[in-house]
Amino acid sequence: MTAINFRNLAHHTIDISSPEVFFVGNNGQGKTNILEVLYLAAYGNSFRTRTESELYATHARSNEYRVKVMYRGEYTHTVQIFSKNGKKRIEKNLKKIRTKKELISSIPCILFFHNDLDFVVGTPERRRFFLDQSLSMCNPLYLEYLQKYHALTKTKNREIKEKRVQLLDALDTQIATVGFDLVQWRTQLVRDFNVIFTKYYERLGDLAQVRIEYKPSWSDSSVEEIVHSLYKRRKHDLAMGMSMSGPHRDKIHFTRSQALFIPQASTGQRRLVSLVLRMSQAVFYTGVTGKLPVLLMDDVLLELDPEKRERFMMSLPPYDQLFCTFLPGEAYRRYGREKTRVYFVSEGACHE
């Protein structure tokens, strides 16, 4: 991995070929920035910001950065990202990519991050994002349909705001056709996830029957029924100035014994839900693709008691590689294996 002018990272290349790579250092030294580079190479965007200029090193003479990650999985992939003045170019194996669909399967990263708690206590949009990400990782067609659905909904909302109803019939037919498949994929995902999620949560949290519940905005069982429902809801949409139903309004809850779980859950139980979601995502990805993911874990053990930390690390799903960040006082060596590589990070530089 090489980074040039990226946040506070020093300009050098580090060997990340070990099965486990640990980055140890105090806060603010650059540990998370390293994981950010790996995530950037996997998805084409940061998990911390949508503002490209925030990624430029403050000491750089120009507003640009370059990162390069070589990943040897089933095939060897080299991903390079060049960014200058807010414009980004991504190359995979020296060829420019035009859509994220071309990149997303190259380095199958799953990130455990403290902001994952948003999937549990945040807005419905954040929980939908988690479902979308889980499906997009292993189903390129889902990502294509999702992008098409959002484009159609955006067009429909524009027509609604302008009170132009002539195109709404045609738009609703397209939205129903694409949206129906999205709902089917999400329904099956949650069904598959629950087999994994419930088992892991019981193992780590000593609590049975914690489940994910998916509540689609549409209850219709065919495209034709959805088209009819959208027509009946049109007056309401026009009154509200936007489309009020569809996959962009779906809800996801966590339940236990058919009651909502999160309102009564402790802080630790909520954090564990976010961790088990990511574990389930990794297992699901492997089950669908037959490939092992790369796990990125950024200071996610801090809120767990020592016993649960140990149990969590021992229960990690199979992975191709594991990248973890730790504070110096944590028992990181206990989690290492024979070939684990440990880097100590200080002021953006790594040393062994």
From Swiss-Prot:
Q: Please give the function described in this protein's UniProt entry.
A: The RecF protein is involved in DNA metabolism; it is required for DNA replication and normal SOS inducibility. RecF binds preferentially to single-stranded, linear DNA. It also seems to bind ATP.
Give the organism, scientific name. Treponema pallidum (strain Nichols)
Q: Name one GO cellular component term.
A: cytoplasm
Q: What is this protein called?
A: DNA replication and repair protein RecF
Which keywords, in A-to-Z order, does the entry hold?
Answer: ATP-binding, Cytoplasm, DNA damage, DNA repair, DNA replication, DNA-binding, Nucleotide-binding, SOS response
Cellular location(s)? Cytoplasm
Q: Where in this chain does the entry annotate a coiled-coil region?
A: none
Name its GO BP terms in alphabetical order: DNA replication; DNA synthesis involved in DNA repair; double-strand break repair; SOS response
Q: Which GO terms describe its molecular function?
A: ATP binding; single-stranded DNA binding
Family, per entry? Belongs to the RecF family.
Annotated residues that bind ATP are located at: G25, N26, N27, G28, Q29, G30, K31, T32
What SUPFAM superfamilies would the database entry show?
P-loop containing nucleoside triphosphate hydrolases
What's a Pfam family this protein contains? SMC_N
Q: Which Gene3D superfamilies match?
A: P-loop containing nucleotide triphosphate hydrolases, RecF/RecN/SMC, N-terminal domain
Gene from which this protein is expressed: recF
Where is it predominantly found?
cytoplasm
- By its UniProt entry, which InterPro entries does this protein fall under? DNA-binding_RecF (IPR001238), DNA-binding_RecF_CS (IPR018078), P-loop_NTPase (IPR027417), RecF/RecN/SMC_N (IPR003395), RecF_2 (IPR042174)
